[in-house]
Amino acid sequence: MAMCEVCGKKVAFGNKVSHSNKKSRRTWKPNVKKIKVLLQNGQRKRIYVCTSCIKAGKVVRA
């Protein structure tokens, strides 16, 4: 679910590092919202879009 359908941003993986430098796996999830978008053919569709794409104006809200 956590994937932007506009830019393809998805879950990133890495390490959580403690003060004693112990490492354990963790994930970073993108801030994805489900919004209604107006497509080029005039159709309305509900898709997952990250907030950076919404802020940049890459999608037109319906």
Curated annotation (Swiss-Prot):
GO biological process, one term: translation
Gene Ontology MF terms: structural constituent of ribosome
SUPFAM superfamilies in the cross-refs: L28p-like
Pfam family name, one: Ribosomal_L28
NCBIfam families assigned to the protein according to its UniProt record, in alphabetical order: L28
HAMAP family named in the record: Ribosomal_bL28
Name of this chain's protein: Large ribosomal subunit protein bL28
Organism of this sequence: Caldicellulosiruptor bescii (strain ATCC BAA-1888 / DSM 6725 / KCTC 15123 / Z-1320) (Anaerocellum thermophilum)
